[in-house]
């Protein structure tokens, strides 16, 4: 019809044409038209070409009926054009018993088929845009307008478009490919309640490829609807598929959605559009596959039944949810499933959410989850980050967002960071994560890091396990909080685990503001290696308060203090090591069972570090350090009052070489206490009293800063205290001193207490090496040495000499002198503290006058050969009851004992400065 010219065939009023091969516009320039109109008007064909080389039109209307039993082609050759309209109950049947019969729209030319107003078409395999030059369009519109096909190829080598609108319906018996071959382009638009329906059940032959090897699009809007098997966008490496679902009641329901199988797939769900996948779904399936999904403005993707959703199976997958978009899965979601897989999930705002039973971020591949700006991620079964050995997962929860793993059920709700692989969880800027139990580094080869950073950032869990069997780290910084509802935190649970809890920053990093732990009753070092690090910037007097118990019998456990001021309030019982590298660690625990607040750990105070002890280890308020002590930093002791005892034990050892600054406390320098300070500086501050026991007490140094030192000796007579201190350095002057490279400041004041008996019992020079006879008491530089020192800083002039009762010993003092138990005289002495001649601290004393009691005998020297130092002397004798002074060059007593009534007895051979001798009672 219309071979070279224009021809028209009208079949109506029950007209009937039985044809074989029918061509409309069979030659170039030909225009052929066939109209089949009215009920029982029939056209039968075998081969039907509408626009073979020219232009052809077929109109089937008002229940007209057409059949084609071999093939039907619209726009057969290049340059041809074929148009078909089936409307108003008209029907076109393109089939026979052979399912391979084809309906071609735009084979090499241009073809368009429109089914409207209740038109019906039944076909087998339908090909739209069959060849490279072919352009085909299929329009199905209006209520009751239906085309039923077996297989639909839209854009085979050419360009194809399918428009389903206004309640139009396409029924697919098997599968559909949109953008079949490389270079092709196919588009399907389902809009205005149009419906693309795949018949039958199950997965077989009900699938859709959007972009098989070419370029495909599926657009569903304005209440359009698609029901199918599995939909794949970007099937082959060259395939590119785009799916758009928008508007309320626009729905795709399928048996699974795959974006980027081996090619590139995109899906955008917006404006309350909905995708329901009743089967496994993936983004980036093969290694070359890239799948991207965007859910926005109230759009939703539901994955139902017992199936997985995988973002980045072996390829790259990205799921972005914003502006109220939602994802809901009734099973598990994987990100980065296989080793080459890379999966990313972005939740971007407060109205966006992601709900899944469980989520595995970085199963064998790499997974990243970013939840921000108030968005919510729910995975109430579990959350795994770094699932398997090669897996690496990162989850970032920020800006008031929530990851919730908790339900009213007691099952699962586990958060595991580093299961068999490497996991990282960052909770920042007010982000919140809630789980039943949280485990970091679950297995021995795994690694997990959790960071809670920023005000209102929160990790809430029942119990916390850091380093279950692998290497795990939890950092609480910048006011981030760990809330432990079950009260227990475990570090390094099983061998060979290493579990580290950082307050502020990690060891070796710059200090940061501290985070907090709430509701925890204990931090326990397990069978592996537990490490508790304090590296923060809180340097206030109150400090960072640690109220929970630190416990655990872990020989490898460590408490590391790098910066800030930290206060331990519990009677900690951990073992291992306490390393005070820098900053101030205060022990403020009060126990009654000997617990020091640092357990049985070995304590090392590095040079910049300071350890403050404000604690007690018994009910009386005393404190005994039972820990091994090392390092060359500062240990300060300030107990609840100055009468509370501080001391060391044998376990303390002799390796501490720093400064022991004793404030409010009482300390005894003997045995273990002395040994502990063998290489250390003892600094005695205000309200400290240190007693020096009998014998040599050898320590590294002594510095006076307002404290009190009691020496176990009496004066005068002694030249060396019964209990004295030997030091390398003695600091008894105001100013700075340096010890082990660290500067300290003292005021050089303090009290030195010695025994000044009332009366003083003259030892009678019973040991000539350590005591002096009375005759020698007026010699130059006579004194008792209290401290022996290699180096002396200061003169001791600011020190105060006191007796054991605390009364100041005046520079001029009269002593009652007893010999052999009887007071026989009074001596006028001068006393002062001095460091001359530069080798220690002395109490210098000098006898200025003797008043001998009447009827008493006074022995000035017990051993022969004694001589007064001064050559000029005075002798007083009795002449008619009046004292006279006799000047003598050098007075020598008789060589035999002479006894004069009322006068003292002198032994032979002694020189004595007689200016010192006064009889107590004139006239005797």
Kindly label every feature range from the protein language model:
Residues 1, 9-11, 17, 22-24, ...:
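Fold-core signature of tandem repeat domains
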Residues 14, 63, 89, 108, ...:
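Tight coil/turn sites that cap or link beta-strands
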Residues 18-20, 44-45, 67-69, 96-100, ...:
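Surface-exposed loop/turn positions within long extracellular repeat scaffolds
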Residues 5, 54, 98-100, 109, ...:
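Short "repeat-start/strand-capping" segments in structured domains, especially the N-termini
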Residues 9, 34, 58, 82-86, ...:
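Extracellular beta-strand repeat scaffolds in secreted/surface proteins
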Residues 1-12, 113, 218, 319, ...:
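N-terminal segments that cap or nucleate solenoid repeat domains
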Residues 475, 483-488, 493-522, 705-846, ...:
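Extracellular, surface-exposed repeat/solenoid domains
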